[in-house]
Amino acid sequence: MKTTADLLKIGDVALVTHFDIDKIPFKLLEMGCLPGNEIRVLQIAPFGDPIYFDVNNGSHLAIRKETARDIEVEILNNKVD
């Protein structure tokens, strides 16, 4: 299912499919937040911002919800409740 990274829930694993290079900070690219890479939601701060991700089972990134909204993803599996 395609969506954006800001709509993922804790435990969701998704594949980054697309983003606008002009809207994504270069530091995220350096840390592996690239199309084709997996991201997993580790934690979401109170009020939903920022969102803490694991990228490719290694880099941990806290991304503002506004930035996560610009990252298109395809959910690979959802958290099991």
Give the location of each predicted region.
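Short, Lys/Arg- and Gly-enriched loop/turn segments at beta-strand edges
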Residues: 26, 46-54
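Short alpha-helix capping/helix-loop boundary micro-motifs
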Residues: 1-2, 23-27
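Short beta-strand-turn/beta-hairpin segments enriched in glycine/proline and small hydrophobics
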Residues: 5-7, 13
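A structural micro-motif recognizing beta-strand termini
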Residues: 18-22, 56
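C-terminal structural segments of small proteins and small subunits
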Residues: 51-81
